[in-house]
């Protein structure tokens, strides 16, 4: 049996207080003109009014509590239903006849020599671990712990990424990719590779970036700042894509920004992979809030365009001041959150194009939703960032169909970046 919360009053007590006040009003009307009696009655009336106001306030609080309890029970029932459905959800089925291939840079690794992308054959050249000293811990992830350090001989700051025990080929893949991208625009620079002599634990040594936490930095960025840093990030993405590499984990946590120096670096290449057309990749990549629909519906022959979706989620969070923009409780709920914004008609068109059949339980969980206009996310707090060109740009990035998203190079040509391109061209010295 459900117990009612103890509130210290009943509805009848409110009625009694009201009746007492009515009696006092009557007495006031017919009382003598004696000041003493009138003051006594007024004092009694004030006491009753205070009691009534207190009871009414408690009653309103009681109603609010009941309403909150009801909402929590409803949310709990919805969550339980979602969790029950989620336990029954199987993998999506992909019918033959609708292969997907990158629109650009598809054959980079086809024409490159095998030793460019064959990371399993990499012979690692180990440096000397004693050349570096750990100063303090700055972060940790699923596969590593990260420390600020210094080079023992010249006291130069660096970042030391100590890798947790994982398959050797995963470590080799990250090293090979970092070596292939070395010197690229806004790519974090790998300085050295060392390992402990006893435990054989490997560590990667990187350039140091005086980064500020994005949760602190992003709310302070101006419209121009956002344009500038997203443009800088696109430079890094176009470079790695042009070298046949997908990052597969683009998110604010992996974008280091030294705001004083206006320097950006794309870090954490642990999930990055070489793109080969037609190859089926693991969909368990990227962080949940930044996972593209292709990952959530088990489309395995994805490509570089995955990084543009993740960038779109990051960008939407910045301009709408809503971090994360798609806030799913699990991978299935992540697809639900996307569908509530982009609509289910568009999702079904995407699934039909690539001949994907969702598990019926996932279809039931997603439900039916109409497309939500981007203007619904604009308010007085973000309207200085969510300008028309920004909204148009986010609309082009956040598309179900990965082949409809712009490439990194196409994205850089969007009108949103005109002020940045204009500033860059004015700084570039003209040839004589």
UniProtKB/Swiss-Prot annotation:
Q: Where in the cell is it found?
A: Plastid, Chloroplast
GO molecular function list: ATP binding; kinase activity; protein serine kinase activity; protein serine/threonine kinase activity
Q: What's the short name of a Pfam family annotated to this entry?
A: Pkinase
Q: Where is the active site?
A: 249
Q: Name one GO biological process term.
A: regulation of photoperiodism, flowering
Looking at the record, the residues that make up the Protein kinase domain are: 132-417
Catalyzed reaction equations: L-seryl-[protein] + ATP = O-phospho-L-seryl-[protein] + ADP + H(+); L-threonyl-[protein] + ATP = O-phospho-L-threonyl-[protein] + ADP + H(+)
Q: Which residues bind ATP?
A: 138-146, 161
| Disordered: region residues | 63-83
PANTHER family noted in UniProt: CASEIN KINASE II SUBUNIT ALPHA
Q: How does it assemble?
A: Tetramer of two alpha and two beta chains.
Protein known as: Casein kinase II subunit alpha-4, chloroplastic
